[in-house]
């Protein structure tokens, strides 16, 4: 990747991360970059959103179960 392309990619990720924070998605920069890359490779964004939501539900349930134990 040349310098200009790398700079453009970085700026795009910065913008996406700012929007993500504004929308209070709770996604960190690394996770967001993975999700963007998956979308760029043809993965359905709605399916990814559903997976993220399900993983969050499962993690919350696991934490709740651990707190009760």
UniProtKB/Swiss-Prot annotation:
Superkingdom of origin organism: Eukaryota
GO biological process, one term: microtubule nucleation by interphase microtubule organizing center
A Pfam family hit: MOZART1
UniProt GO cellular component terms: cytoplasm; gamma-tubulin ring complex; interphase microtubule organizing center; spindle
Localization in the cell: Cytoplasm, Cytoskeleton, Microtubule organizing center; Cytoplasm, Cytoskeleton, Spindle
Similarity field: Belongs to the MOZART1 family.
Function text: Required for gamma-tubulin complex recruitment to the microtubule organizing centers (MTOCs).
The protein's name: Mitotic-spindle organizing protein 1
Species the sequence originates in: Picea sitchensis
